[in-house]
Amino acid sequence: MSLPTVLRQAPLVAALVLAGGQAHAAADSLNLFTEGEGLQALNLQELADASGYDTAQIDTWLRGGTYALRSGGTPRAWHYDAAAGILYFAAERHETEHTARNAHRLYRGVADAGPMWVVQGPGPATGSPGVFGERLVLEEDQVYAPWSSRDPEAHYWFWDYVYAGTSKDRLRLPLALPDPVAGGCGIQPRLRVHLQGSSDLSTDVDHQVLGILNPDGNGPSASVAFDAFAAQVLDIPFSSDALAASGNELELVSEPRPGVSRSLQRLDRIEVEYCRQMRAEDGQLWVRQAGPGVVTVAGLPGLEIAVIQDPGQPTAVWRKDLTVAPDGAEGYQVSFDAPATADYLIAHLGAAHTPATEVDDPSDLTSAANAADYLIIAPKAEMQAAAEALAAHRAADGLIVKIAWLQDVYDEFSLGRTSPLAIRTFLETALTWNRVPTYVVFLGRGTLNHKGRPDHFPGESLIPVRMASGPWGLFPSDNRYCDTNGDGIPEFACGRIPAETDVEALAYVEKLAAYESATIGDWMDLMIGVADDADPVSGDFPGDAAVSEALVSSLGYSVNARHFTGAGLTQFQDALKAAWNQGAALSAYWGHGGYDRWGAENFLPLADIAGLSNAPRLPIAAGLTCYAGNDSYPGFAALAAAMVVNPDGGAIATWMPTHQSLNAGAVTLGDHFLELLAGDKLTVGEAAAEAKARALVDDVPAWELDLFEVAGDPAVRLP
């Protein structure tokens, strides 16, 4: 089977294209990033610092209403307090597995929705705080468990778990429900508990979970049964008087099913609808579906109060027809007339949040006129110097190079919001370019904690991972970015340079340049073949290695075979490191593995990789094993990534799996990969793509194709 057409294009004239990288004196468009919901504020100096325009010019434009604001594809009205020099707007909550930030674009031009209408006048007589139907999402991401789902788009971070048949068969959780009140509010109060089945030990239904609201008070309860690795919602309706003023709890009980000794369920999140008093929390309150009539909100810390009718909409109204009075609890309350049922945002001005700002440089990634052989996707703030150095290096080889800054990808394909799907959609669009890229480089590490959860090593993940599904759950797969039609075969030669910093990435570019200009030596015709001892269940690893090594030998390479026999571990480790430090063009491994090792006995441990000093005599390393390419665990480096980012040695590129593989499929993939690399002299990215195409014909399952990915530059060749 021939390589996909887009991988066979020859370069045109060398060129370097920086997408969105041009210098500018001032910016007419800003990205504003918010977390949570509520009132946002930017003063003139903050806008000037972000945009490069002076405060007087921005003040003139704001007074003239010549700015527009959009979020989620919808125009949003804003309010400018000219006396204070502050721009206000309402932000809605946007939270996914990958981000807690919503994105807004503030730009000059034809206004889709300009400033809010302002309603002046006296307010109504003050009243008592009202009641409304609140909808809250309670969620804590405490632990990741991608093996618990089979849906690649599902959540894989969870709050907690219950486990029937163990001492952890019940769980009691506090419910943070501000100001609940008894009585009606026009809704049916209920809890929706989102659960994920995490075991499959029965041919019948595996799971049954009982939920009890306020179990010490004999509160309402409900149960649900479901199977295997399914997601399920436990629905618990209740009456308003079932909630206490504070201290509400939910108990979950994992109940044993007939014939099932143990069953595991994970808690994702809890959605709560209840009747809530109109009392601000932290100086703000978003009241949903209030009115008609007088609305009163208490609990505000001061007299400077904003009320926005229809917040976050193009028809939003800034209300000044208010009555403010003490609320009798050392705070203030505001009353206003609601002419119709609507949402209202009430906030003390001092409680407004300040959004993060970033210049929104123009980009044209959707244009069919684009042309590139080599496409770099990189986060500009973290990787600009390295991206431009890598681009210059490949442009010097005669390739047309384009950098697509990650935020530009989000701006054009996911409304500015962080989303792996935006990257996939962008690459689909790149297939329509005048010159379709052969190579795609993801410049930056990706982990399961791209959201930046504070207790799980935030800041490591620069480009989010995309998940694939296999027999043992979910696993990270850059192949699901580059395989745009879902057949398991990528349309591009893809690789990820798993650096966490610009400095680390620049060191890799220097390592790459030294490798590609290395002095000719015997190492360039050498392969190190490494094999685990045979496993009667998993595979004859030495036998598989011998067949593949014979193939590589027939292609003109000497083979230094290092096959572990189960004895003499220390000597084997020392000999392998010594051979590696002598240098080789190619290395391959057959056997058991983990994210941090080759061999169940750990004869090539992660801890040894930093000590390898074989640069520039660097191999392309293939790991026909399990997990060794999975660099997605927060706080832990993978063996493959460590080889690539070691500036003094290791490997120039690797091809290893991110999860558990089947030996037969791994061997088939490996044989094709080695033949294409050493025989056809393809680049590592091209060899990886074509190996998957050939393996699919050989009946290797598509999920196993998603496992293997390139760490390093996909345009690397054997010397």
What residue ranges belong to the model's regions?
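Intrinsic low-complexity/disordered segments
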Residues: 5-6, 19-21
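Bacterial N-terminal signal peptides
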Residues: 10-19
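Intrinsic disorder/low-complexity segments
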Residues: 1-2, 17, 270
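Cysteine-dependent hydrolase recognition
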Residues: 25-719
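Bacterial N-terminal signal peptides that target proteins for export
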Residues: 1-11
